[in-house]
Amino acid sequence: MTPQLIEILSADEIRRTITRLASEVIEKSGDLNNLILIGIYTRGVPLANLIASQIESLEGVKVPVGAIDITFYRDDLDRIKTRTPAKTKMPLDVTGKTVILVDDVIYKGRTIRAAFNAIIEYGRPQKIRLLVLVDRGHRELPIHPDFTGKKLPTAAEEQVKVYLQEIDGKDGVELIK
């Protein structure tokens, strides 16, 4: 059977969602000079850059952006295909900072748990918050986003695919049934 593709967010809707998420981060974060955005490879990194760019556009504050690879922090290394780790890039020490971890989709919560472990190796943040473009539910761990672009209840066998211009040459979110 051919998979059915359903558009969830168009390019324009992603742009508006990023603007809204940036506004929420500004509103709920207080001191933007104490803020660091850290994107999870792969699509969390360009999302973090887009959020930071929007914050700068709205508030005139350049928020540092880092990128973190969680490959060696995963708890399912025995079940995933061999993957070459990406390079973690941290803008500065996270100690005492508010870190906003950015990812494209949250599902079971295991990627986020791995990212928490990775971040702690770079210092002790004052707090870690989570921003996701899509929350599809089905958590196995007690992890919930502080900032959510779109809540999308899904069946376990369905997939959510995020496309970003910087990686995929287009912007959009699709549900694959």
From Swiss-Prot:
Motif position, PRPP-binding: 99-111
E.C. numbers: 2.4.2.9
Single annotated GO MF: uracil phosphoribosyltransferase activity
CDD domains in the record: PRTases_typeI (cd06223)
Gene Ontology terms describing biological process: regulation of DNA-templated transcription
Reactions listed under catalytic activity: UMP + diphosphate = 5-phospho-alpha-D-ribose 1-diphosphate + uracil
Swiss-Prot/TrEMBL keywords: Glycosyltransferase, Transcription, Transcription regulation, Transferase
Entry-linked PANTHER family: BIFUNCTIONAL PROTEIN PYRR
Functional description taken from the UniProt entry: Regulates the transcription of the pyrimidine nucleotide (pyr) operon in response to exogenous pyrimidines. Also displays a weak uracil phosphoribosyltransferase activity which is not physiologically significant.
Protein known as: Bifunctional protein PyrR
Organism: Microcystis aeruginosa (strain NIES-843 / IAM M-2473)
Source taxonomy: Bacteria, Bacillati, Cyanobacteriota, Cyanophyceae, Oscillatoriophycideae
